[in-house]
């Protein structure tokens, strides 16, 4: 009798469990494979992405990086209508500061830095005379004379605008990738949104500059440098909208701020293809 009772009890338990599983499967919750996945997972090639789309009363939250939820340490800039959603407007002596560009420098051998910008006419230094402006820079303790390990200069007017990218590696060797002199670019500072992508290939040691999805024919190179090899440990700040130095009240060209608008700032640890860059432009990303 005891064996029969145990068998009945076991059978009842199995029946209840089976019914429970069946009822769970009929619920409206999606199966595991149906849950949406983040297209930009933290371990992917997109290492830093600030859309500047926040509309809260907290400016640090409005400038958050979407990859690692890396909030800005400081954001004194105004939110404006961007090329897609919201963007930011740079002002004299002000910029957005992050403690790090996440792990971008740790993993980048090749890289792509892409963003949208809007600037009307002649670039100015912080005292109002003609001079360079910086969409971004990495402040660094690497000992480089500039105080940084990477920065981008946009300088000139709508008729002739120079673009200059400086990179210093772990050994404090540096290189300038420039489009200046006879290779300046017209039409960049016309108070309209433009997309810029800077693509470094470790295979060629060259940087391809894309404007609105179109590659510039001038591809400056860094000899046979290969992997970019930036010292991640020495990066002390990622600055959006300023050079790497701190002499803000002077005409110091390394301390000048960006006085236009910016949106969709992205940093990849790979060299995007032309098709990838064109997709960013076409999608206003």
For each predicted feature, which ranges?
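Short surface loop/edge beta-strand patches of beta-sandwich-type extracellular domains
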Residues: 32-42, 91-111, 178-186
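Flexible glycan-contacting loops in extracellular carbohydrate-active proteins
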Residues: 219-260
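Extracytoplasmic low-complexity segments
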Residues: 20, 24-93, 234, 278-285
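Short tryptophan-centered beta-strand motifs in secreted/extracellular beta-sheet-rich domains
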Residues: 115, 191-200, 209
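Sec-dependent bacterial lipoprotein signal peptides
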Residues: 1-24
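Extracellular, beta-strand-rich glycan-interacting domains
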Residues: 48-55, 112-121, 253-283
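Short, aromatic/His-centered strand-loop micro-motif at the edge of beta-sheets
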Residues: 165-195
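Glycan-recognition/cleft segments
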Residues: 132-170, 227
């Amino acid at each position: 009798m005891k064996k029969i009772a145990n068998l009945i009890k076991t059978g009842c338990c199995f029946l209840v469990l089976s019914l429970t599983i069946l009822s769970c499967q009929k619920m409206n919750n999606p199966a595991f494979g149906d849950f949406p996945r983040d297209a930009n997972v933290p371990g992917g090639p997109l290492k830093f992405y600030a859309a500047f789309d926040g509309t809260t009363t907290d400016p640090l939250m409005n400038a958050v990086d979407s990859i690692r939820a890396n909030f800005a340490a400081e954001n004194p800039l105004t939110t404006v209508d961007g090329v897609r959603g919201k963007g930011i407007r740079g002002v004299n002596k002000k910029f957005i500061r992050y403690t790090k560009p996440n792990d971008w420098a740790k993993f980048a051998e090749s890289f792509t830095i892409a963003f949208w910008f809007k600037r009307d006419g002649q670039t100015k230094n912080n005292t109002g005379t003609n001079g360079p402006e910086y969409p971004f820079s990495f402040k660094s303790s690497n000992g480089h004379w500039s105080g940084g390990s990477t920065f981008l200069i946009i300088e000139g007017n709508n008729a002739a605008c120079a673009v200059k990218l400086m990179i210093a590696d772990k050994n404090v060797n540096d290189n300038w990738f420039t489009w200046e002199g006879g290779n300046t670019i017209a039409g960049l500072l016309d108070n309209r949104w433009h997309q810029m992508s800077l693509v470094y290939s470790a295979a060629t040691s060259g940087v391809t500059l894309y404007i609105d999805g179109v590659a510039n024919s001038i591809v400056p190179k860094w000899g046979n440098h290969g992997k970019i090899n930036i010292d991640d440990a020495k990066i002390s700040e990622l600055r959006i909208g300023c050079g790497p130095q701190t002499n803000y009240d002077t005409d110091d060209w390394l301390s000048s701020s960006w006085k236009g608008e910016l949106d969709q700032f992205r940093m990849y640890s790979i060299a995007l293809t032309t098709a990838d860059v064109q997709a960013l432009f076409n999608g206003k990303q």
